[in-house]
Every structure is written in structure tokens, then in C-alpha cells.
Regions:
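N-terminal membrane-proximal hinge/A-helix region immediately C-terminal to the signal-anchor transmembrane segment
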Residues: 2-147, 161-162, 166-180, 271-274, ...
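Conserved cytochrome P450 K-helix E-x-x-R motif and the immediately C-terminal K′/meander segment
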Residues: 64-82, 369-417
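Cytochrome P450 heme-thiolate monooxygenase catalytic core
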Residues: 121-127, 163-337
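Cytochrome P450 heme-binding "Cys pocket" and the immediately downstream C-terminal segment
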Residues: 213-214, 350-352, 460, 473, ...
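Cytochrome P450 I-helix active-site segment
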Residues: 225-229, 234-241, 296-301, 344-396, ...
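Short, small-residue alpha-helix embedded
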Residues: 334-347, 487
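Conserved cytochrome P450 K-helix/beta-meander segment immediately N-terminal to the heme-binding cysteine loop
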Residues: 395-398, 417, 425, 430-458
């Protein structure tokens, strides 16, 4: 007997599903309109439509910046705020989604702090980053995120940050590499950027794992014969290259928005494998250490490293690996790029450099003996230089959150932008830290200029968030600022002058997970005469 009725039933089910979905969306829209009306919310302006539907042409420009020479921030994003004359607007994403974009501190405060529970990282971020970082503090929400943050927080006490022995060794290694190329009264031109990445890698691995990878000396061929084969294999310059490739791929996945999965391939997979090998090396060391008695470990080391602490909580090697890679991303890349921009600005602004060097001499003398967390904080011009660098070049210039429920932003809607903006559950809000840090109505007409003096007597508020804010504020911000300040002091103590020898003009920005000087940091140093 022929089952002639089966296709008809199937077609009916399909129609019913479509009708149900449309009806559900209709009811959902009515509820959202009532929600928006209850809060007095109005629509913000929409960005001008692109030449192609769904913003395809804009996404193409984002992905083609290397070939076109356009700057993602200055040429593609900031002009949209300027065209509309507003600090909050709505744009259309690649898959047709309605995206809110803002550089208003009141809205950013609402997202990150006031209405924190209304917002989340979201599943897309996890899928964009998860191939490399797995499930960890930067890719999780809710109780899972709270768990990971709780594990990491104890490492970032003032006592631990003030333990600067590993930082001093990393400084000496960097200075040693610079001085090798010395010629007459000046060193040869050197690109500081890769050296700074190795400095932060060496310092971070000491801080997190209790042992430096010695990447600076290994890369320069200056490491001692006593370094083990495992050190040379697992901690070599190859990791730097692999991590850079992973960072670039993750950045491309962000630009592709909902089509992030298109950014993949054998080269990316190989880089991920290399980065994971690096992390797995340390996981195995930590698990081996954990197999010893706690008493024996206490006799061998003054305190547990963070990884050893994590190993007390879980013996799952995948979870440990994910936490390591997240910490390395924050501890290495963020600090290295802060230092890269700082040295670039100081080399190009010799008067500020001279003032800073004089203050360092007065405060710290010629050696590391008096450098502590407290003394670094007490040197005003040193802190002002770092604050100003992060204002102009926040290492994470653009970030976002996803609405976990229907919610509102306090301003940006209506004809004059004074009304609230209603945001639907699942909607993305991009917040532009770079743009907010350069708003002339906040910072003055010289907002684009490097002027550390502007920080004298100025208090930090929501106009300035280089380390984010609210409950998810960067745990390692004091660690990063201390590492950066320490190296600045030691370099300016060692070398009487630093001169810019790179390309003049507007600095080109490179975008991975963080923002870095695309052309490197090309300088030379004068040598101290006997």
C-alpha cells in the first residue's frame, strides 16, 4: 500500500513550523516594542548603507586592509561616527543582524558595570577564539567564568606583583641583546618589537610558571649550555611565530563576524597545534610536580606558580592548557604592545623622554635596588607616560558584548541622542575604546597628541578604560603596568638617549587580538661612556 499521504504530512509540518516561527517573532516584536516604550527608548541613527547588501563591501574592506593600506580604525570605523555626528549608531552586520556601535562612556559603563548581568561574551566569541584558547576566562560566561576568574585572582596580589626578580632577569637579557650590536657611541638600529615580545614572554612564564623560557637568549643564540633540550624545543622562537599567526587568524575571524568559520586552513591549524604543544609542555611539568607531595614542593620553591595552583584544582590537561594560553595572551601580548607604543612615542618625543629620564635618575638612581611596586607608582611622570600611551593606543581598541536579555543603553536614541536605546536579547553592542579615548569634547582639541602632562591632577573615570571595567576588568592590569614601568626605568637608566630611526609620519597600526605598531619600533640607543 502506497503511503501517498507522507509527503503531504511533511509539507504540512514544514508550513506549520514556518507559521509558528513567524508568529513567535511577531509576538516577540510586540513585547520588545512595549519594553522599549516603557523605558522611553528611541531609535539611534543608522549608518549609511553600503554599496552591497548586508555590509558585504565593508567586510571586504576590513579583510583587505593589508593590500589597500587602509587603517581599520581611522579609515573604516571612525568615519562612520563622524558622518553621523553621533557617538552611538546602528549598523547592519554581515548576516543582516542589527548591531549597536557606541563610544559614549555612559553606555559603556552600563554594558560593563551597571547592567553587567544583562550582557555576556556570547557563544560567537567562544567559537571565534575557542580553537586556540579553548574554554577559559576570555571565552566563558556565568558560573564558568566566575570559576576561572576565581582561580586566577590569587596570583595577582600586590605581594606577587612586587616580586620582581624574574622581571629584572628578563630586563638584563633584553639589554644584553641590544648591547651586542653596539657600534661606537650608538647601538646599531634595532626593532624593539620582537625583543619586547620575548621580554614579556620570559617575564610572564616566570610569573605564571615559576621558570623563564629564556626566549630572548635562545633567539639571539646566547643561551647558556646548561639550558635543557626541552627548554630549547618547547620554548623557542617558533612559538612566537605560531602565536602571531594564531592572533592574526583570530582577528580575521572577528572581522568575518558570523562567518568566522571561513577563516580556517592548514596553516592556521598547524599554528594552533604548535601553540598547544607549547602549553602542553608546561601542563605536563605541572602535573608531574603535583604528583610530588606538597611538602616537597614547598621546600623546592618559595611559592606555587599559578599553574601549580590550577593543578591542585583540576588534573584535566585540556582545562589546564586552556587557562595557560589565556593567561599568556594577556600577560605577553598586552604588555608587549603597551611597551611597543610607549617606546615608539618616547623615541619620537625626545623632550618627554628627557624629562622622564631625569625623573628616573632622581627617583631610582642607576640600578634596580630601589625599584618596587610602590616606588614605580610614586613616579608621577612615569605613570603619566603609560596612561597617555594607553589613551592613544589602547591595546584592545574595540570590544563587544551580546545582550543576554532585553535591555537598554542610557543614551544615544532620538533626534539628539539623549534618549535611551533599547537592545534586544542576542543583539551585539560594539564599544569603541579607541574612539572614546580620542574624543575632543572629552580630552580637548589636542586629543590626538601625545601629552602626558594632561594627566596631572586628573582622576580616572569611565572616559578611560584601557583595561576594560566592571566585574570583568582585567585582573592583570597592575601586573602589566608594573612590568612596563620596570622595563622603562631599566632601559632609560642604562642608555643615556634613544633615537627614532623608523619611518616618520603617522604610525601604522597592526591588528591581531591586540593593536601593535605595524612597522615595528625601530630605534637606536646611545651608550654610556665609562
Amino acid at each position: 500500500m502506497a503511503l501517498w499521504w507522507v509527503p503531504s504530512i511533511f509539507a504540512l509540518l514544514v508550513v506549520l513550523r514556518i507559521v509558528f516561527s513567524e508568529l513567535r517573532e511577531f509576538v516577540r516584536n510586540i513585547h520588545f516594542q512595549r519594553f522599549a516604550k516603557a523605558y522611553g527608548a528611541e531609535e539611534p541613527p543608522r549608518s549609511l548603507p553600503g554599496k552591497l547588501p548586508r555590509g558585504i563591501d565593508r567586510v571586504y574592506r576590513l579583510l583587505n586592509t593589508r593590500n589597500s593600506g587602509e587603517d581599520v580604525l581611522d579609515d573604516l570605523i571612525m568615519p562612520r561616527f563622524k558622518e553621523l555626528g553621533r557617538n552611538t549608531f546602528v549598523s547592519t552586520g554581515l548576516l543582516g543582524e542589527r548591531v549597536v556601535n557606541t563610544m559614549d562612556p555612559r553606555n559603556i559603563q552600563a554594558v560593563l558595570a551597571v547592567n553587567f548581568k544583562d550582557w555576556e561574551i556570547g557563544t560567537r566569541r567562544h567559537r571565534q577564539f575557542g580553537t586556540v584558547l579553548g574554554t577559559a576566562i576570555f571565552t566563558s560566561d556565568g558560573a564558568e567564568w566566575s570559576h576561572f576568574r576565581g582561580l586566577a585572582r590569587p596570583q595577582f596580589t600586590r605581594e606577587n606583583i612586587n616580586d620582581l626578580e624574574g622581571t629584572e632577569k628578563a630586563c638584563r637579557d633584553l639589554i644584553r641583546v641590544i648591547e651586542v650590536d653596539a657600534s661606537q657611541n650608538w647601538t646599531q638600529p634595532v626593532n624593539l618589537r620582537p625583543l619586547l615580545y620575548r621580554f614579556t614572554l620570559d617575564a610572564a612564564t616566570t610569573f605564571f610558571f615559576g621558570k623563564s623560557v629564556n626566549s630572548q637568549l635562545i633567539a639571539a643564540g646566547m643561551h647558556e649550555a646548561g639550558l635543557s633540550a626541552n627548554d630549547s624545543r618547547a620554548l623557542s622562537e617558533d612559538f612566537d611565530k605560531a602565536w602571531t599567526e594564531c592572533s592574526e587568524w583570530m582577528a580575521a575571524r572577528i572581522r568575518l563576524q558570523g562567518l568566522y568559520w571561513l577563516s580556517n586552513g592548514p596553516k592556521y591549524n598547524k599554528a594552533v597545534e604548535r601553540v598547544r604543544d607549547f602549553a602542553n609542555h608546561y601542563v605536563q611539568l605541572a602535573l608531574k610536580s603535583h604528583s610530588q607531595s606538597k611538602t616537597e614542593i614547598d621546600l623546592q620553591t618559595r611559592r606555587f606558580s599559578l599553574l601549580e595552583g590550577l593543578a591542585q584544582d583540576t588534573s584535566n590537561p585540556i582545562e589546564l592548557r586552556d587557562q595557560i594560553l589565556s593567561l599568556l595572551m594577556a600577560g605577553r601580548e598586552t604588555t608587549a604592545n603597551l611597551l611597543s607604543w610607549t617606546f615608539l612615542l618616547l623615541a619620537q618625543n625626545r623632550a618627554t623622554q628627557a624629562k622622564l629620564r631625569a625623573a628616573i635618575q632622581d627617583t631610582f638612581g642607576d640600578g634596580p635596588e630601589s625599584i618596587t611596586f610602590a616606588s614605580l607608582k610614586s613616579c608621577a611622570i612615569l605613570q603619566h607616560v603609560l596612561l597617555e600611551t594607553l589613551r592613544l593606543y589602547p591595546v584592545v581598541p574595540l570590544n563587544n558584548r551580546v545582550a543576554a536579555c532585553d535591555t537598554v543603553l542610557p543614551v544615544g536614541g532620538g533626534p539628539d541622542g539623549s534618549k535611551p536605546v533599547a537592545v534586544r536579547k542576542g543583539q551585539i553592542c560594539n564599544f569603541m575604546v579607541y574612539g572614546m579615548h580620542r574624543r575632543e569634547d572629552i580630552w580637548g582639541e589636542d586629543a590626538a597628541e601625545f601629552r602626558p602632562e594632561r594627566w596631572a591632577g586628573r582622576k580616572l573615570d569611565w572616559n578611560y578604560i584601557p583595561f576594560s571595567g566592571g566585574p570583568r576588568v582585567c585582573l592583570g592590569q597592575q601586573y602589566a603596568l608594573t612590568e612596563a614601568a620596570y622595563l622603562l626605568v631599566r632601559i632609560l637608566q642604562t642608555f643615556p638617549d634613544m633615537e627614532w630611526v623608523g619611518t616618520r609620519g603617522k604610525a601604522r597600526k597592526g591588528y591581531g587580538i591586540t593593536m601593535a605598531p605595524a612597522g615595528g619600533v625601530w630605534v637606536r640607543f646611545s651608550r654610556r661612556t665609562p
